């Protein structure tokens, strides 16, 4: 495991990410890469500090955990310098593939997140289906661009307006996973793994999103599991997620 600092052109500043490697690497060998996005209020250390995700590297995976602040992993509508989507899909992937023994094709690339990161993982995969073969959203804040926070929670509404743009704006539509699915070509989309706890306020939105995936004939699976919105619960969902992922990404020939 190591922490990397690199310069992001999209953000015009240095950023950090954590990497976990397979235990045995031979010269010339390339490994699938899983990008793990943290949730709101978190940081790039959360995945390795609060879960046992590192053990899945032993399956022959490179795990990458980038810093994302509270960005929702989106290009901010109100702060042009905060282009977090571009940072991930352009700068981060390029840096990882330049520095490490990473496979460089879609079939060997996955993206996964929890909460805010679950939204980010699903949204980035739907927006860039040429980059990812698999996306996993655990307890995803999947409906956040369509929540009228400005009415009941003004401070949060202002922050979300800064990120996603005004209600009904094109930037908000561009960041709405429901709209992306509605106009998606099912044959081009990555496989989606969704999981949400029975005690979570996000369950209804995740059920609705899964129903839309079914309607649009996208490839997916959706699990409703016991528990709430905690790292303890998320850690328990990792075995089924990685088992599903392993069926859909593979090492380079």
Regions found by a protein language model. Name each.
Residues 1-253:
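Non-catalytic cap/lid and distal C-terminal segments of serine-dependent acyl enzymes
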